[in-house]
Amino acid sequence: MSETAARIQTPYLVAEDELDRSLRPRRLVEFVGQEGLREQLAVAIEACTARGDALDHLLLAGPPGLGKTSLAQIVAAELEVPFVQTAGPALERKGDVAAFLTALEPRSVFFVDEIHRLPRALEETFYPAMEDHRLPITVGQGAGARVVTLELPPFTLVGATTRTGLLTTPLRDRFGIQARLEPYAPEELAVIVRRSAQILEIGLEDDGARAIAARSRGTPRVANRLLKRVRDYAEVRMAGIVTAAAAQAALTMLEVDERGLDRLDREILHAICSK
C-alpha cells in the first residue's frame, strides 16, 4: 500500500498528522528560541507591511526538525497573505514552476522545502521571477518558437534547506534574507515540551519536561515525538502524569540514552568507529 493510500485509509495516521500540525506555533510570539532570527523577521515583516511591499526572499537553513516549515507558515500568517507550499523534488519541469508562480496572489509566500534538490535546469527559471517578477515562457517549437514574458505579482520565495552547500551561488545570492537555525538549548526545549503538553492536555511536571528535553538532541521535532511516547507510557504504566521517573522509565524502554541516541543511532556510530 502506498503512503498516500495508507493515509487515506488509516484514521490513526490522519489523527497523528493533525496532532503534529496542532503543535506548530502560529505566530512569532509563540515561536520558542532562535531569538536573533525572530527579531530579524519581526523587523523585516513590520517594515515591508508598512510599505505595502512583499517581504524579501528568505532562505532558511539548518538541520531537520528545527522549525523551518513552521517559520515559513508564521511569516505568511504575520503578513496575512496566502501560503503556498511545495518541495524541490516535486518541481521537475519549467511548467511545474510556471503553474505555481502564475497562480500566486500579490505578496504571497511561496515555500519550497528542500530547495537544494531543485533541478539545476530549473533554477534559472526562478531568477527573473525573484528579481523582476517576470517569467519568460517559450511558446512553440523550432523556427516558429517565440518567448512570451508573463508579469508576476510581487511575492516572497521562502526556501528551506538542510544542505546550503548544494545551492548554487546565483540562487543563494538572490535571497535578501538568509538565516541558519541552530539546535535548541535544553531550557528552550523544556518550554516547547510544556507548551505541547498543554495543547495535548497531558499532565506534565517540570522535571518531566526537563528529562525529555535533555534527550531531544536539541530538536523540537524529537522533543514532541518523545513527549507523546512518554505520555503513552505514563498513561499505561504510571499514574498518567509525566514525571521525571515516568520519562526515565519510558525512554529506557525506548532505548534512548542520556545523549538522545537510540539503538539504531548507536549501531551506526559503532559501525563508523569500527572502520
Where are these regions (language model features)?
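C-terminal helical "lid" of AAA+/P-loop NTPase domains
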Residues: 209-215, 221-236, 267-270
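AAA+/SF3 P-loop NTPase mechanochemical coupling elements
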Residues: 140-160
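Conserved AAA+/SF3 P-loop NTPase catalytic/coupling segment centered on the Walker-B
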Residues: 75, 94, 108-138, 164-174
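Conserved AAA+ ATPase core "coupling" helix
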Residues: 166-214, 224-225
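Walker A/P-loop
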Residues: 46-88, 98-106, 127, 162
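Pre-Walker A (pre-P-loop) alpha-helix and adjacent loop at the N terminus of AAA/AAA+ ATPase modules
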Residues: 15-63, 98, 207, 212
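C-terminal engagement/docking regions of AAA+ P-loop ATPases
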Residues: 2, 7-13, 22, 245-275
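Short amphipathic alpha-helical elements of helix-turn-helix/winged-helix folds
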Residues: 44, 233, 271-275
